Amino acid sequence: MIRENKGDIAIVKIRRPKVLNAINQDVFDQLREIFTDIRKDPNIKGAVLTGFGTRAFVSGADIGMLAALKTPAEAEAKCTEDKSVVNLIEDLGKPAVCAMNGLAFGGGNELAMACTARLATQGQKVFVAQPEPRLGFIPGAGATQRLPRLVGMENAWTMLRSANPISSTRAKEIGLIQDEVKGDLVEAAIDLLKKIIAGSVSITPIPKGPIPVSSKLPEVDLGSLSRKTDSLLQKAILEGAKTTLAEGLKIESKVFGECLATEDMKIGIDTFLKEGPKASAPFVHK
């Protein structure tokens, strides 16, 4: 992690280039420390969060960290702990702009959604995804709750259940990001942040209450994805929509723990660790 101050703005950069800035426990711990300091520092008016390099903002969570989980209770507790870092950014008391300098998968998108606003490098064909179902589990750092509240239930329903990526252009269309940037992304983020601080730009925050759910949600082609994981994912999304964001996040953590009791989470993680991210896991739907 790198932090530098530019006047009254903190620039926070996640730096793990060999793994496309994937988040491990050390990154979570440093994010907690850095953003706690930012919140307490009266001289800092806001923050920009970005990633090192040009290929990825954050490529997701370190899967080895998840493979070490032994029980549903342990998985739920880990989820709750990780969420506390994401919630810290959301509840910073100061605006934060995410400069999404490359793909934002899994926990990368979840960190971005906790920020006040999001900007992306222009023209990214593969930009944002919640690929967790490909590994046999649901998102665990807020996506099942924040994504529907940010882009609408129909868009989130398809993104979450299909696990397919969307482009930066599509992300702007559905309201996941504020804009695509052709030039210097961090400078554009600083400029937007200054406007938010000055009150000349207003960003609508993610709703904290229940959200409406259409009686007919889009059909989603699951392909070879686990039907067991999908049923748990639907449960987290739909139950969370009926309640507050805070309660929905607790539901997500609990359901993430339930994933650990399935055969398909073990199959998905084993396949990823042995064969890599492009391998299709032989799920048994249990």
Region spans (language model):
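Crotonase-fold acyl-CoA enzyme core
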Residues: E90-V126, Q130-E219, G223
